[in-house]
Amino acid sequence: MKIRFSTEVESSLIAGKPVLALESTIISHGMPHPDNVEFALKAESICRQQGVVPATIAVFNGECCVGLEKAQIESIAKDASTKKVSRRELGIAIAKRWSGGTTVSATM
């Protein structure tokens, strides 16, 4: 399984700085657009204000992404074909190249 880390998350992990994993189904399935984008960006901003690097996690085209760019957050927030991916669906999501928001179980 390939995992893609954002530059910010990767740099923080290398430097030993704190990183906080955030699930993304609240963005993809839990809130209406555009409230979901606003919520996600605000949550990440609060993390940074506290000295923690946010690592929102989602699956894009079968690839696990740890730390999302704003465009990726907007994509899972708006795209009706975005799947809800729990730990149970991770293998299928990767094999079928799904894009999806991750539940807490898949995020962990």
Q: What are the residue ranges of the model-derived segments?
A:
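Internal active-site segments that recognize and position negatively charged phosphoryl groups
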Residues: 101-108
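Short, hydrophobic/glycine-enriched beta-strand segments
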Residues: 18-22
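Short alpha-helix boundary/capping motifs
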Residues: 2-3, 37, 101
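Glycine-rich nucleotide/cofactor/substrate-binding loop typically near the N-terminus or early
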Residues: 24, 29-31, 36-92
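N- or domain-start disorder-to-order transition segments that initiate the globular core
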Residues: 1-16
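Active-site mouth loops of central-metabolism enzymes
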Residues: 93-98
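Short hydrophobic/aromatic-rich motifs at helix boundaries and adjacent loops
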Residues: 13-17, 78-81
